[in-house]
Amino acid sequence: MLAAVNPKTQEFLNLLLWSTDILMRPTFRNLTDSYESWAYRSGLLKQVTRLEQQQLIERDTNSPDDRLFRLSAQGRLHVLGGRDPEERWSRNWDGQWRMVLFDVPTGQNAQRERLRRYLRDKGFGYLQNSVWITPDALEEERRILVGGKINVESLVLLEARPCAGESDAEIVAGAWDFERINRRYARHLKILGEWSGGSLRNEAAAKALLRWAEEEREAWLDAVTNDPLLPERILPSDYLGLPAWRRRMEVLREAGRQLRTFNRQ
C-alpha cells in the first residue's frame, strides 16, 4: 500500500529519484542555489521534515554536517509505483498457475465487487469475471480470504497446470489485456522522447523541465500501476514495459545531471 501523499509531495519524491547519476537510493543536498531549492523555495525544509517523519527519506548518518538525505527503501518503492519492476520481472516462477474461483450469491454484490477489485489491484488476470489467475503463490490470499466465513461452495483456491495443450503464452494473452498495457507504455515512451537536454540557464528552462517531469511521472505511474509485472519468462514478446523501464533509467539519469547545471538568475 502506497503512503498517502499529495501530488506536490509525490512530485518532490520523484525529483529525488533522479537528482543524482544512479537510480538506486540517491542522495541530494539541500544547497541554497540547488534546483530543488528553487523548485520548492521556502517550502523545501517543510517537505524534508514531513517526508522524514513518513520514513520516505532518511538522514545520511555519515554526513558530518547532518545536511545529507537520501530516499529510503520505502521512499524509492513509493516513487516507482509501489513495486520494484526489476524485482518483479526477475522473480522465479515454478510453472504453476494459481487460480481463484468464486461464486458469490447475487444478493452479495458489494462483496463480489470488493473481491474483484482486490484481485485486480493485486495484478491478477481474469479468464472470466469469477475465474482469476496469477503466477504467484496465494499465501496472502489464503490468510485474507480463507480466514473469513467463505465456504468451499463460494470460493476455491487452486494450483494448476494446463492439461489440454494450452501454452503459458496463450494463458497470459487470455488473462491480461497487453494491448492496453502497451498503449500506456507507448505514451510514456513518447513523453520520454520529448525530454530536452541542455543546461538550465534560466527559470524558463527550469520550469519547462518541471512540467516535463510531472508529465513523465504521471505517465509512468499510469502504466506501471496497471501492469501485472509478470515474470520475464512469460511476458509477451512485444511487451513494452521492459524497454520503457530501460529508457526511463537512461533519460532520468541524464536529466539528473541536467539538474546540476541549474543557474538561478
What kind of feature is each model-predicted range?
Residues 89-96, 104-106, 115, 122-133, ...:
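Basic nucleic-acid-binding interfaces
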Residues 51, 96-97:
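Mobile, glycine- and charge-enriched loop segments
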Residues 101:
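Short hydrophobic beta-strand that contains or immediately precedes a catalytic carboxylate
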Residues 1-91, 109-110, 121, 135-139, ...:
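Long, contiguous binding/interaction regions
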